[in-house]
């Protein structure tokens, strides 16, 4: 029997410091319909900066 497709979608978290650095993660579209914003470490500028959700192409 085929496995049901889940609610989780792969997303890319892009640094707001415009360094080009990004993280990839998954989020549940049903529980979090809004765009994700989270503060994470950017190793290029060596600081914690805001990362914003973007689609994986």
Swiss-Prot record:
Annotated keywords: Ribonucleoprotein, Ribosomal protein
RNA-binding keyword on record: no
GO cellular component: cytosolic large ribosomal subunit
InterPro entries per record: Ribosomal_bL33 (IPR001705), Ribosomal_bL33_CS (IPR018264), Ribosomal_bL33_sf (IPR038584), Ribosomal_zn-bd (IPR011332)
Pfam families: Ribosomal_L33
SUPFAM superfamilies per the UniProt record, alphabetical: Zn-binding ribosomal proteins
Similarity section: Belongs to the bacterial ribosomal protein bL33 family.
PANTHER family (alphabetical): 54S RIBOSOMAL PROTEIN L39, MITOCHONDRIAL (PTHR15238), LARGE RIBOSOMAL SUBUNIT PROTEIN BL33M (PTHR15238:SF1)
Full protein name: Large ribosomal subunit protein bL33
Gene: rpmG
